Amino acid sequence: MIICMILVSRIAFFKDAEFLRAVRDTMGKNRMSLAHKREKPIKGIIWKKNLKKMNFLSINFKDYHVKDISDLEYFKNVETIILTYMGDNEEDIGMYNEEHILDNLNKVRDFNKLRRVQLYHLNADDSVKKECPKAMVFID
């Protein structure tokens, strides 16, 4: 029973199904990005220790309709976070209408290695910078 509890405590349980889909589709050795999308999604268990190895995380909400970014808490050693809403070409730009998408950005507040946060085409203002005091925050 104790061994089972220890094993379960090492598994990443995602609150947002689209965030999980993004991880399964784009997670590499130490980065998560659509630029390096996998041929086949990862199947099975996602271990917390593998997410801690990520130093770069990028999610395009045009492809993954994430509503809750609190799952960022698993990426404790990330250095760069890019959250964006963009299509394949420059004309295909809009604003992500998920009003509260950045409500849980405070999950990264104590990430010691976080140096850069880029937010593109999201409902964000300068108050977001308070959630990431150790990082340079770029909003467009």
Write out the residue ranges for each language-model feature.
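N-terminal capping/linker segments that flank leucine-rich repeat
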Residues: 1-140
